[in-house]
Amino acid sequence: MKKNLFILVALFGFIVSCTSNQQAVQTTMEPYAEGKPYTRWWWFASEIQNEDIKYQLEWLKENGFGGVEIAWVYPMRGDSTVKHPKWLSEEWAASVNYAKRTADSLGLGCDFTYGTLWPFNAFDLPDKYGTRSFYQKESPEDRTLTWDHPRKARIINHLDKEAFAYYAKQMDEGLKDAYKGSKSGIFVDSWEVETRHLWTEGYGEKFKERFGYEIEPLMDKLYQPGYEDVYYDYMTLMSDYVLYDFYKPFTDHAHTQGAFSRSQCGGAPADLLTAFMLVDVPETEAILYEPNYGRIPASAAALAGKDVVTSETFTCLYGWRKWGGKGPYQDEEQVADMRLIADALFANGTNQIIWHGMPYNKKGNGKNDNHFYASVHVGPDAYFKDQLKDFNDYMTRVSQYMRKGKVYSDVALYLPLEDSWMGVEYPDSLQMPWVWGEYELRYVFAPDYLAGYQPLWVNAKVLSEASFNEGTLKYGELAFSALAVDVEWLDIAALRQIVRLAKDGLPVIMAREPKQPGKNKSEEFGRLYGELMKLPNVSARRDDVLKQKPLLEGENLPDFWCRQDGELLYIFVANPAAKKLKYPLRYGQAFEDQGSVREVVVNTVAGPQSLQLNFRPNESLLLKVDKEGRVEVIDLGFTAKKI
């Protein structure tokens, strides 16, 4: 992350007085600086005791964790008789403040989920600030699984920055002292607001002003075949609301509190690459989102000049069951399976693990007391406790290497956002109870002809702000040798930028002839495409355009991620068994791997170097490449054992 993002107000060692008899230490330590895994820390509504807070934080420190994200949830098992402090009360805040000061004293980071569960909701939220669909005259007040369960709450309107401001004022009053000390992240989880027919006041007027026709008479046909162009226009405006009435205000507001934003933008009905670029720390999730998805937030971080890409990790490892019980094989998790997921994430750009997660428990209690239903169980009684410290140390080492220098870049790859909006719904085979729309971009991969390159996703906004000079496409600190566009649909605004850059000399792969999405078609689209394809530096064939050799060449290449640190390259190559992992994992899936070999060529600045990659079962490789072309395999020093 850019260095100036996390500069703190006071110098290391400056002591400030706080409530109670403890003191908070102001520190210049950057969040996530050491790369040690964090854990989500489930605080079930109850009487949280300081001695238990201290015990759990000390245990985390001893076991290789770097910090926590406190997440406030319902009473265990939904038991409304459990005594607990009122949400955001002074008594509630006292425990939070103690946790933050104790974390600071131990050198641990401390982030906060910005609310009780998700999406953001409030108990006394006025109707005008609540979320609603086109067909709802009032916002439903139907959230009950919250800290104050069964008290009903209302989800905020994520399309109205005034609604967020109202909500944030309440949250900041509760967290005002917890913001002191080391810099904390405030976290927003994946979208999880109902998106079908989503609406807000003034939407219809803005839509007509922008597109020249009324959307209201078409809302009941929005998801029907034949109305894809209308849905595309609806999503185009919806995206602007989501980006600039929610994600940008969320980040801007975090800065006013001396905090930073961390966000899973997954599931948002928006231009996802831009959404991830707007937050300070973009976050993916695995394995409810499969590891390939992580390349979107990783690309966003690289484009926006941010170093840290986090992942909520090991969620629903072996599957999901409804709230009220434990998931499949919960409390029996194999470290080797978890490593498979972690390595797949690293090979798609993640460089900071957030465990999901650890429940608050009294000292001496454990997984049969407080537990979260969709989570790996982290705690002194974890099934994998004997390997936990070593596993955390392994993930720390990889994370540290994957922070060195900057992201290596060679090919810019256009993200098929328009395809997803024109596709509307996933086929039944790809839908899940919580997934229906292609707008989520869950199943996008780089085309096979870019195997061995490290393509980063780009979009129309990036292209509009990029330039081509001195033989490269430049955006921020990144430089690309070529642009690949392999889509069925392409917005005319993006096509205009592609033509501009190609006329300046940018090599462009136009793998297919795209069509113009949206209800308002233009003859300009065809003319622009014709101009583009007449340019000598534009072709449908990769070999006519790409002069730069791929970083790796070979058959059936594993997934990898590369960082460039001056004249050195660090390439994390995931075990082939980690490629294209699917939800859910089979129990013990990692042990099905018997080891494998890949013969590859590493194309270095000094020339091609042949290399045999020997993958031991359930292990990945880290390569260091210097300017002379020497390739060193770095020992990552960890083998997961079967439990």
Where would I find each of the regions flagged by the language model?
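Bacterial Sec-dependent N-terminal signal peptides
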Residues: 1-26
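Mature N-terminal segment immediately following signal peptide/propeptide cleavage
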Residues: 24-67
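Acidic/aromatic-lined carbohydrate-recognition and catalytic surfaces
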Residues: 73-161, 165
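Phosphate/oxyanion-binding active-site loops and adjacent basic polyanion-contact surfaces
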Residues: 49, 155-168, 387-391
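Acidic, contiguous N-terminal accessory segments
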Residues: 19-30, 633, 638-642
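Carbohydrate-binding surfaces of carbohydrate-active enzymes
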Residues: 37-38, 49, 53-54, 67, ...
